[in-house]
Amino acid sequence: MEKQCSKFIVSGHVQGVGFRYHTSHQGLKLGLTGYAKNLNNGDVEVVACGTPERLEELYLWLQEGPKTASVRQVRRLSSELEHDYQGFEIL
């Protein structure tokens, strides 16, 4: 199956609550590669690459996030594969 990448912008109370760590763990569990990083405006940017089905599973998970977070919105953008990510990094 073709590998795709998606970029997600997660808004809400998502910084300082372990969101990136849990996202990285979930991404690896789903067999995805990519990263999660904090943005200056308080959002978290997630780029994930893998099969469309696994990306959809991550998208659904991001809408809830870990129990410590309060997700208000998840915006999903398609992303050109700019980098062949190894693992799922926390930036």
Swiss-Prot record:
The Acylphosphatase-like domain, residue ranges: 5-91
Catalyses:
an acyl phosphate + H2O = a carboxylate + phosphate + H(+)
Q: Where is the active site?
A: 20, 38
Record EC number:
3.6.1.7
Q: Does the keyword Electron transport apply?
A: no
Family the UniProt entry places it in: Belongs to the acylphosphatase family.
Q: What is this protein called?
A: Acylphosphatase
What is the native source organism of this protein?
Answer: Vibrio cholerae serotype O1 (strain ATCC 39315 / El Tor Inaba N16961)
